[in-house]
Amino acid sequence: MMKRCTIEDNALVCSILGHPSIYPWVTDDSAPPLAFLDYTPFLALDAVYVLMPRPGCLTIFMPINGVTWEVHSAALPESRGDTMMEAAREALAWMFENTPCRKVVTCVPSFNSLALRLAKQIGMVPEGVNRRSFLKDGVIYNQTLLGICKEELLCRQ
């Protein structure tokens, strides 16, 4: 069952996104130290959807405009692989069915091959490269922009 996280779930969200096997992959050099992690401001926004389709799996949708959201996902080690892929597909379908969302995009730094693979597995297609746009450990990386439209997802079901 799909759970939309609220400010009451901040500790749970922080425990997942702050996990040692996740935090280094979902942050850049401007991220706060782990001790200061707090997602309450995001969880309080009506237009931001922090979804937990399966235990240990988070999918965060942030609006770009009235019909397009940017997505990022994270899963605890025991929820990776097929579980995360199914959770991401469920969250994507939920967004298209329950919000005005018509398109979902993501930006994947070139060093994150697992995130790139997940995006492609759920039907997202590469749409371009945002060159030299992600700073991690003092190194600047390109990001691949991927996207999927509501109609494309419906055709795959």
Protein language model annotation of sequence segments:
Residues 1-26, 45-157:
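Acyl-donor (CoA/ACP) binding surface of acyl/acetyltransferases
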Residues 27-48:
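Active-site rim helix/loop that mediates acceptor-substrate recognition in acyltransferases
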